[in-house]
Amino acid sequence: MHCDIYKFLKHDDMYIYIARPDYPNDTDEIKDWLGVLPKDFRAGLGRSKFVMHLDLATTPTLARVDKEEVLAKLASQGYFVQLPPQDVMRRQAELRARESQDSIYNT
C-alpha cells in the first residue's frame, strides 16, 4: 500500500496518511487527495503541507504508530490520523491554558 503523508501548520506533530492504492497509475491527473477526509474535520485542519510519499510494503516499521493499524485504517477509510504523543499533547494543552490565563490577568 502506498500513501502520501501531510502535516498541518495549525496542528504540531499531527500527520495524516492518505491511501494511494492505485499508485503509480493514479498520477495522470491532479487530484485532491485530502478529499477523503470528512469535510468538518478537514476544515478545522487549516493549510496542509505535503511531507512525503511512502510505500508501506517496503517499510518495516513506523516511528510512532503501528504499521498494521495504519494499513487497516487506510484500507477501511482511506486515511489515517497520527496524533502527537500524549506527553506532547499535555504540554501543548498546559501552554494554551497558561497563555489564556495570562491574557485574562495581564490586560
Curated annotation (Swiss-Prot):
SUPFAM superfamilies according to UniProt: YcgL-like (SSF160191)
PROSITE patterns referenced in this protein's UniProt entry, alphabetically: YCGL (PS51648)
Domain YcgL: 1-95
Pfam hit, one: YcgL
Domain of life: Bacteria
Record InterPro entries: YcgL-like_sf, YcgL_dom
Cited PANTHER family: PROTEIN YCGL (PTHR38109:SF1)
Protein name: YcgL domain-containing protein Pcryo_0807
Species in which this protein is naturally found: Psychrobacter cryohalolentis (strain ATCC BAA-1226 / DSM 17306 / VKM B-2378 / K5)
